[in-house]
């Protein structure tokens, strides 16, 4: 008989760009585009250098200045105007892919804002365990009959919403402590190199028009074919059983998700799976983060109160990145089936196995 405490190794393989944000953005006054690279200097070190060069006041005025011409509000403009060739300000660089902007390959320098990837205390990018845990929760919610039913919707109040009390979560007064997801503990990933990051643009593909529309939203994202590992520890029999079944549950979730949503879009925009499927991070679409069958109708009403409406089931969330080929037993396999460099934003695969600790 197995002990309550069990440990699993989850190996994640990104099939598309994945963005885990920290809620912050770089403005055009905080990064430099030149020589086919985006350079994000350490702004503290940058300011100290300006103090040394007696340009601190001038730089402060530049930061609060508003000019009609956006080009003149860029950090590169300040450097050029003050004849500063130095670039030793710490920070990091991200190489250009040529697909950052919808306009043309030479317009990457016109990007005004970049959503930051989350970083640890040492400034290194990583994936928090809470992000993976949220994706696991979505899979388990959609594949467990006692949660995936009519009780999943709370009709109390003006607008229906998810019933947060369906799954035991946290202490409840007068009740025995029961918190399933506290019994599923997901580690943070190890930090990875900035070389694994690319900049990507948001694209929305409409099933109604069969066209992809670019949006002026840019994200630091993990590039496709990046391998990242996590440890999952379970502390109860129920939690251990659910994680043991995570692979087949992920396949069941994807089968239903594809029938519900992905089937409405061209097959060449949908990526094939190599392992167990999962969607992670920002920009993968609302249906990948909820009980989609129960949320159908609720999400549309919620979006009706926003500036951007959801028509029917909404749009497919895509982005562009360079073509990647992976070797599989049957030969070379392209991660995408289209010639436009479109990937499903946030898509990944994983393998999982129990390990001894």
From Swiss-Prot:
* Molecular function GO terms recorded: RNA binding
Cytoplasm is among the record's keywords? no
An example Gene Ontology biological process:
defense response to virus
Q: Which UniProt keywords apply?
A: Antiviral defense, RNA-binding
Give start-end ranges for the coiled-coil region(s): none
Which InterPro entries does the record cross-reference, listed alphabetically?
A: CRISPR-assoc_Csm5 (IPR010173), RAMP_III_fam (IPR005537)
Q: How does it assemble?
A: Part of the Csm effector complex that includes at least Cas10(1), Csm2(3), Csm3(5), Csm4(1), Csm5(1) and mature crRNA. The Csm complex is elongated and slightly twisted with a maximal length of 215 Angstroms and a diameter of 75-80 Angstroms. It has been modeled to have a central protein filamant of Csm3 subunits along which the dsRNA helix of paired crRNA and target RNA binds. The filament is capped at one end by Cas10 and Csm4 and at the other end by Csm5; ssDNA is thought to bind to the N-terminal HD domain of Cas10.
UniProt lists the family membership as follows: Belongs to the CRISPR-associated Csm5 family.
Q: What does this protein do?
A: CRISPR (clustered regularly interspaced short palindromic repeat) is an adaptive immune system that provides protection against mobile genetic elements (viruses, transposable elements and conjugative plasmids). CRISPR clusters contain spacers, sequences complementary to antecedent mobile elements, and target invading nucleic acids. CRISPR clusters are transcribed and processed into CRISPR RNA (crRNA).
Further remark: Encoded in a type III-A CRISPR locus.
The protein's name in its UniProt record: CRISPR system Cms protein Csm5
The gene that this protein is the product of is csm5
């Amino acid at each position: 008989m197995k002990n309550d405490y069990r440990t699993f190794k989850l190996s994640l393989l990104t099939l598309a760009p994945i963005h885990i944000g920290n809620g912050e953005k770089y403005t055009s006054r905080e990064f430099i585009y030149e020589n086919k690279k985006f350079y994000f200097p350490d702004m503290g070190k940058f300011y100290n250098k300006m103090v040394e060069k007696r340009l601190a006041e001038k730089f402060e005025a530049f930061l609060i200045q508003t000019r009609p011409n956006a080009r003149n509000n860029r950090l590169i403009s300040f450097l050029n105007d003050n004849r500063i060739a130095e670039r030793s300000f710490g920070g990091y660089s991200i190489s250009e892919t040529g697909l950052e902007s919808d306009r043309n390959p030479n317009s990457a320098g016109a990007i005004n804002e970049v959503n930051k990837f989350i970083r640890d205390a040492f400034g290194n990018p990583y994936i928090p365990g809470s992000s993976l845990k949220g994706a696991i929760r979505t899979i388990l919610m959609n594949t467990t009959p006692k949660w995936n039913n009519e009780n999943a919707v709370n009709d109390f109040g003006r607008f229906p919403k998810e019933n947060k009390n369906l799954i035991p979560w946290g202490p409840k007064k007068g009740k025995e402590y029961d918190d399933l997801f506290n019994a599923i503990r997901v580690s943070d990933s190890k930090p990875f190199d900035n070389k694994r990051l690319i900049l990507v643009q948001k694209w929305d593909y409409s099933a109604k028009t069969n066209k992809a529309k670019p949006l002026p939203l840019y994200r630091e994202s993990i590039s496709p074919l990046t391998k990242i590992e996590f440890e999952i520890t379970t502390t109860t029999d129920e939690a251990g059983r659910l994680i043991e079944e995570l692979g087949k549950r992920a396949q069941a979730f994807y089968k239903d998700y594809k029938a519900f949503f992905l089937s409405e879009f061209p097959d060449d925009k949908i990526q094939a799976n190599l392992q167990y499927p999962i969607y992670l991070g920002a920009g993968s679409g609302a249906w990948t983060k909820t009980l989609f069958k129960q949320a159908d109708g609720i999400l549309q009403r919620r979006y009706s109160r926003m500036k951007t409406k959801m028509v029917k089931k909404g749009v497919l969330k895509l982005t562009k990145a360079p073509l990647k080929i992976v070797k599989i037993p049957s030969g070379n396999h392209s991660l995408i089936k289209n010639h436009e460099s479109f990937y499903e934003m946030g898509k990944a695969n994983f393998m999982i196995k129990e390990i001894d600790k």
